[in-house]
């Protein structure tokens, strides 16, 4: 029997991120399904999802995905709409970063969809924060090259 290079049992192998396997096939939406982005994690297997048809829905993570596929805020998911409840849906599939980029490039996702490489930690704003680092006191620069004293500040 050969010796493995990993230490420990199943949990030691869990941290290893092997992406050598074949890429999985991209799943497109069908009738009764919609693409969405997770806006808030609610707990108890539920998330608040902002669907790309313009509605915000409470999404239920189905048992096949629960505890196996970890979801976070900003992730792109595929939800199955319910016929009898318009404000609720079921999470069918979670797209990884490369799949979400591919969907956006193929026109499946709208252009204004933000695919987050990093988590936005609950800050959900469409406008960018701009800082101007201009000269606040331009009269100080008019030929005086004196050093600042601590008392002047």
From Swiss-Prot:
Instruction: Mention any additional remark.
Output: Present with 35100 molecules/cell in log phase SD medium.
Query: What keywords are annotated for this sequence in UniProt?
Result: Initiation factor, Protein biosynthesis
Organism annotation: Saccharomyces cerevisiae (strain ATCC 204508 / S288c)
Quote the PROSITE patterns the UniProt record gives: IF1A, S1_IF1_TYPE
Q: What is this protein called?
A: Eukaryotic translation initiation factor 1A
| Ranges of biased composition (kind: Basic and acidic residues) | 15-26
The record ties this protein, via SUPFAM superfamilies, to: Nucleic acid-binding proteins
Does Protein biosynthesis show up as a keyword for this record? yes
Family according to the record: Belongs to the eIF-1A family.
**Pfam family example for this protein?**
eIF-1a
GO terms for CC? cytoplasm; cytoplasmic stress granule; eukaryotic 43S preinitiation complex; eukaryotic 48S preinitiation complex
Q: What does this protein do?
A: Seems to be required for maximal rate of protein biosynthesis. Enhances ribosome dissociation into subunits and stabilizes the binding of the initiator Met-tRNA(I) to 40 S ribosomal subunits.
Which CDD domains does the entry mention? S1_IF1A
Q: GO molecular function terms here?
A: double-stranded RNA binding; protein kinase binding; ribosomal small subunit binding; translation initiation factor activity; translation initiation factor binding
Composition-biased stretches (Basic residues): 1-14
From the UniProt entry, list the residue stretches annotated as the region Disordered: 1-26, 133-153
What highest taxon heads this organism's lineage?
Eukaryota
Q: Which InterPro entries match?
A: NA-bd_OB-fold (IPR012340), RNA-binding_domain_S1_IF1 (IPR006196), TIF_eIF-1A (IPR001253), TIF_eIF-1A_CS (IPR018104)
